[in-house]
Swiss-Prot record:
UniProt keyword annotation of Transcription present: yes
Statement: the UniProt record of this protein carries the keyword Nucleus: yes
Entry GO terms, CC: nucleus
Primary gene name: AP1
Function: Transcription factor that promotes early floral meristem identity in synergy with LEAFY. Displays a redundant function with CAULIFLOWER in the up-regulation of LEAFY. Required subsequently for the transition of an inflorescence meristem into a floral meristem, and for the normal development of sepals and petals in flowers. Regulates positively B class homeotic proteins.
Domain MADS-box stretches: 1-61
Segments for region (Disordered): 180-206
Name of the protein this chain belongs to: Floral homeotic protein APETALA 1
Length: 256
């Protein structure tokens, strides 16, 4: 006899229900993978357990891309066939769509942070790992580019500072050279002003007759001693007669 048709109904035993759910879920994911490989189709499968736990499967394409594609397609068709009276309904559906998208993004964010990974299959974990590796490559590439640009900017500033220092050093040397030349010129002028004037030549000097009186001549001191060294003593001599006029007078008398 052939096997009878199994009646589908809710399994009352919680343990049996959980075991059946795990087996059927694995078989369903396997069938989805087979159809995606054999038929080259994009498949997205979402399953929620009776406790609200999420299980999903997608092909090599990202789950978000498949859902966005489905939403665009279904929303465009609904817009074509929906009457104007269903505008409020469309807004409600749009709200639900955005809400589901936010929940999906939050879940992916938790996955990227390494949280809530228990419900993910090995295939999903592998896809997540590939996405993280790609993100790390982009991050490292961007970081290296920023560091390279920063080094080039610092080198450019260093070159500009070196050129400025060279120009300032050249200006300082030129200024010192000018100051040194001015100092030498000033020293030469001061040296020429401090030198005594040269004495007049002796052979061209003419003695005036009246200058002969400054030559020493014999004196007759009748008031006291004469000291040539002390000028004050000369004032104490009331009578200092020169012998030269007397001598000249006597010679004149004898001659007459």
């Amino acid at each position: 006899m052939g096997r009878g048709r199994v009646q589908l109904k809710r399994i009352e035993n919680k343990i049996n229900r959980q075991v059946t759910f795990s087996k059927r879920r694995a078989g369903l994911f396997k069938k989805a993978h087979e159809i995606s490989v054999l038929c080259d189709a994009e498949v997205a499968l979402v399953v929620f357990s009776h406790k609200g736990k999420l299980f999903e499967y997608s092909t090599d394409s990202c789950m978000e891309k498949i859902l966005e594609r489905y939403e665009r397609y279904s929303y465009a068709e609904r817009q074509l066939i929906a009457p104007e009276s269903d505008v409020n309904t469309n807004w409600s559906m749009e709200y639900n769509r955005l809400k589901a998208k936010i929940e999906l993004l939050e879940r992916n964010q938790r996955h990227y942070l390494g949280e809530d990974l228990q419900a993910m299959s090995p295939k999903e974990l592998q896809n997540l790992e590939q996405q993280l590796d790609t993100a790390l490559k982009h991050i490292r590439s961007r970081k290296n580019q920023l560091m390279y640009d920063s080094v080039n900017e610092l080198q450019r500033k260093e070159k500009a500072i070196q050129e400025q220092n060279s120009m300032l050093s050249k200006q300082i040397k030129e200024r010192e050279k000018v100051l040194r030349a001015q100092q030498e010129q000033w020293d030469q002028q001061n040296h020429g002003q401090n030198m005594p004037p040269p004495p007049p030549p002796q052979e061209h000097q003419i003695q005036h007759p009246y200058m002969l009186s400054h030559q020493p001549s014999p004196f007759l001191n009748m008031g006291g001693l004469y000291e040539e060294e002390d000028p004050m003593a000369m004032r104490r001599n009331d009578l200092d007669l020169s012998l030269e006029p007397v001598y000249n007078c006597n010679l004149g008398c004898f001659a007459s």
